[in-house]
């Protein structure tokens, strides 16, 4: 696919651009390492549990459950996770896009209401819950927020890839 090749070509420099703020804030990652690990892990777990509960309450099928599980990770990873778990990839993509856009739109307000004002916490929240679209918002808030959001995209994606085969057995 010619169009996908062009898109892939642009992803490499975009990924490097996300790594630069993280590299500049490496000292914060070292300082807050445990909090970072707990935050991202609990964010991924909370997402999985909330999807599980929503599927139970709404009477949704196993297919819908595994379709929605990767909603908070990037589209490229989420599509593969959904397909491998037996989900409906098109619906997964839609749920990922909606999650990112909503996170971008209301994330800052939610953080203010929750009285979360630490830049590291803000970045982790945006990246873990709203992936690349949330990271765009986090970068707009500051370099620390953007760096932590970039990190959490990668780690949340990895944890989700590991967790989905386990979580998919529950419904």
Label every model-predicted segment.
Residues 1, 21-29, 57, 86, ...:
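Transmembrane helix-loop junctions in multi-pass membrane proteins
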Residues 1-20, 28, 32-35, 39, ...:
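Helical membrane-embedded segments and adjacent short helical loop/helix-boundary regions
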Residues 52-64, 83-91, 168-171:
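Helix-coil boundary and interhelical linker segments in multi-pass alpha-helical membrane proteins
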Residues 13-21, 40, 44-56, 75-79, ...:
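Transmembrane alpha-helical segments of multi-pass membrane transport proteins and ion-pumping complexes
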Residues 18-31, 107-115, 134-141:
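C-terminal ends of transmembrane helices
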């Amino acid at each position: 696919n010619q169009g996908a090749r062009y898109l892939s070509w642009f992803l490499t420099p975009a990924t490097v651009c996300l790594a630069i703020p993280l590299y500049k804030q490496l000292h914060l990652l070292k300082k807050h390492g445990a909090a970072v690990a707990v935050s991202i892990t609990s964010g991924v777990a909370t997402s999985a549990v909330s999807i599980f509960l929503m599927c139970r309450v709404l009477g949704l099928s196993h297919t819908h459950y595994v379709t929605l599980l990767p909603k908070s990770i990037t589209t490229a990873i989420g599509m593969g996770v959904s397909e491998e778990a037996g989900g409906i990839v098109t619906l997964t993509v839609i749920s990922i896009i909606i999650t990112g856009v909503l996170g971008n739109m209301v994330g800052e307000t939610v953080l203010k209401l929750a009285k979360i004002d630490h830049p590291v916490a803000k970045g982790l929240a945006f990246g873990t819950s709203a992936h690349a679209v949330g990271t765009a918002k986090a970068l707009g808030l500051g370099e620390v927020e953007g760096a932590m959001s970039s990190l959490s995209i990668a780690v949340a994606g990895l944890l989700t890839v590991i967790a989905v085969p386990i979580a998919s057995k529950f419904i």
